[in-house]
Structure formats: C-alpha cells, structure tokens
C-alpha cells in the first residue's frame, strides 16, 4: 500500500516487518531567493556602459569607407547624426565648413583648429587636415576629432601619385583651355566695361579742369611775352631817347645777369632745366591740382582706375592672342 507523505508527488514503500523504525521527518525545502537588480545612471543610455560599439551622441567620428573618409557628427538644430563624404584631394576646409552650414542653417559659426589651438586656413586641403587630430568648433562649442592613422606611402607610390596629378591637370587644361580662355575674355570685357563706366564721370570733370588749367597757363605765357616786350621797349626808349648807349650798356648787363640768377634759382628749387616746355608743364600741373581740390576731384582714384583699365586691356590682348594661336594650331592639325 502506498502512503502520501509531505510531497504528494513522491511515493514510499511500507517498511517490512521487523525493520520498522520511527519515521524521520523529511528536511524542509530552502526558502525561495529573489535576485534584485538596480540600474544606475541614465536609463536611456544604459547600454553604453556595457557595449563599446555604441557611440556617444555628440562625438564626431572619422572612418574610411571605399577609400573615402566619412565624417559623422550630430547636427545642432535637428539633433540628428549626419554623415559627410569628403573628397580629400578636391575638398578644402572652407568647402567642408560651407557644407555643414548648408546642411544645418542653425550653424552660425564654424571653424577648425589644430590640436594645440592654431586656426587652420580655409584653403587647406582635407587630405592634409585628416593626417592629424583636430578640433571642430561649431557655434562656439569645441569637439575633439581623432583621425584614424593611415599608412605612410612609399616613395614610389608618392612619385606615382604626383605623376598622376600632373597628368590629370594637363589633361584638364587641354580639354578646358578654350572654354577657360573664353570665360576669361568675357570676364575681362565685363571688367573693362565696368571700369569705363566708373571713369566716364571722372573724365568729364577732368576735361573741364584741364581746359581751365590750359587757359590759365596760356594766359600766363602771354603775360610773360607782354612783360618781355615792355622791358625791351623801355630799354630802347631809355637808350635812344633818354640816355645814351654808354650809360645803358651796364644797365642791360646787370639785367641779363639778374635773369641768369633767376634761371639758376629755378634749377635749384625744381631740379629741372629752365625750358619753356618744362615751365609750361609745371605751371599747368599746379593749376590742375589747385582746381581739382576746389572741385573735389580724386586724382589718385582716377590714376588707379586708369592703371586697372590699361592692365585689363593688356590681359585681354594676351588672351585673344593665345586663343588665336590655339585656333591656328588646330587648323594646322586638321590640315595635316
């Protein structure tokens, strides 16, 4: 016969006669234990304490994929992670920062500094920048960017890359030379037209000032001729009608010597020979600058515009000459 003990699922046999012993109580089962786990830190990002593959939300990473670097960062306005593909040999620091601002309009200021705090110019190639660690400052918040180490290329690889760059540059120049020269010619024509528009009002004012200065200079020359005529007439009148030649001869000598002293003093002051053309030009310039100040005519600006116009015309002449030579070479090649 079977008996039920403390555990109804277990069976016991009755003791045989002669072997009966007082029954021992079965040991009680241990009390159940409960495992309690307490989470520490921010529950939203608790996995980051256990898995090293999760990237903090504000970290900027640089990885290489298919030979091109990918810069991953968090946009400040949308709080989204965004990847930027960088072309090391074509992109510059300025173009990369411009791409950041175009992607997120909330980026007001952006700059890149070296690890020791020196600012990197906008014309620096990204290939040079990604050789070392740097700091990216967005809206006055600095982020440390660690670039993966790249293997140093061998001398043969460097020489091949330089040769390839030179070959690509020459090929691009040959294919786009005519187009670039036409663009340059168009740009020079626009520059010449713009300079002429700026010079037109100045030319009108200058023409009026020149006419006024020329009139005053001519009047001064005629006044000098009149004074010399009066001097000659007075000496003749004193010689033949008032005094004799013996008395007037020393007077005319001293007058001639005084004129020589005046001419020598003019040379000392101006460092120029006393010639009528030099005196006229000097007097004309004096009248011209005096009248220019009265009419607020900027002589330096006018001279600068004239120099720029002359340089632009010379550059246009050279561009057209080179384009003409290229067309002649193409015609000869077609004939051959």
From Swiss-Prot:
Coiled coil location: 179-210, 297-323
Where is this protein primarily located? mitochondrion
Could you provide one GO biological process annotation from this protein's UniProt record? Answer: mitochondrial calcium ion transmembrane transport
Q: Which residues cross the membrane?
A: 220-240, 250-270
* GO MF annotation list: calcium channel inhibitor activity
| Pfam families noted in UniProt | MCU (PF04678)
Q: Which UniProt keywords apply?
A: Calcium, Calcium transport, Coiled coil, Ion transport, Membrane, Mitochondrion, Mitochondrion inner membrane, Transit peptide, Transmembrane, Transmembrane helix, Transport
Q: Which InterPro entries match?
A: MCU_C, MCU_fam
Per the record, the similarity remark reads: Belongs to the MCU (TC 1.A.77) family.
Identify the PANTHER family for this entry. Answer: CALCIUM UNIPORTER PROTEIN, MITOCHONDRIAL, CALCIUM UNIPORTER REGULATORY SUBUNIT MCUB, MITOCHONDRIAL
The protein in question is named: Calcium uniporter regulatory subunit MCUb, mitochondrial
């Amino acid at each position: 016969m079977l008996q039920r003990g403390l555990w109804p699922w277990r069976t016991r046999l009755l003791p045989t006669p002669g072997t009966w012993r007082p029954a021992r109580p079965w040991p009680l089962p241990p009390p159940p234990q409960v495992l309690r786990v307490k989470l520490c830190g921010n529950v939203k990002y608790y996995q980051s304490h256990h898995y090293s593959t999760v990237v903090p939300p504000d970290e900027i990473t640089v990885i290489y994929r298919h030979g091109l670097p990918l810069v991953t960062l968090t946009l400040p306005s949308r709080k989204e992670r965004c990847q930027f593909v960088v072309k090391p040999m074509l992109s510059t620091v300025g173009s990369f920062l411009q791409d950041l601002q175009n992607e997120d309009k909330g980026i007001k200021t952006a700059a890149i500094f070296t690890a020791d705090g020196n600012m990197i110019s906008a014309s620096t190639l990204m290939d040079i920048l990604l050789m070392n660690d740097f700091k990216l400052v967005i809206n006055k918040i600095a982020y440390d960017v660690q670039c993966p180490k790249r293997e140093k290329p061998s001398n043969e690889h460097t020489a091949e890359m330089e040769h390839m760059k030179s070959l690509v540059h020459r090929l691009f120049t040959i294919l786009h030379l005519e187009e670039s020269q036409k663009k340059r010619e168009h740009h020079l024509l626009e520059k010449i037209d713009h300079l002429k528009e700026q010079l037109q009002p100045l030319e009108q004012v200058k023409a009026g000032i020149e006419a006024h200065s020329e009139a005053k200079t001519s009047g001064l020359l005629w006044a000098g001729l009149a004074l010399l005529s009066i001097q000659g007439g007075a000496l003749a009148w004193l010689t033949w009608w008032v005094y004799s030649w013996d008395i007037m001869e020393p007077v005319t000598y001293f007058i001639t010597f005084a004129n020589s002293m005046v001419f020598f003093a003019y040379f000392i002051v101006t460092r120029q020979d006393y010639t009528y053309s030099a005196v006229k030009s000097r007097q004309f310039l004096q009248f011209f600058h005096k009248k220019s100040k009265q009419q607020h005519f900027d002589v330096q600006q006018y001279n600068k515009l004239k120099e720029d116009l002359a340089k632009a015309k010379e550059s246009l002449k050279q561009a057209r000459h080179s384009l003409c030579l290229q067309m002649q070479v193409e015609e000869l090649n077609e004939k051959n």
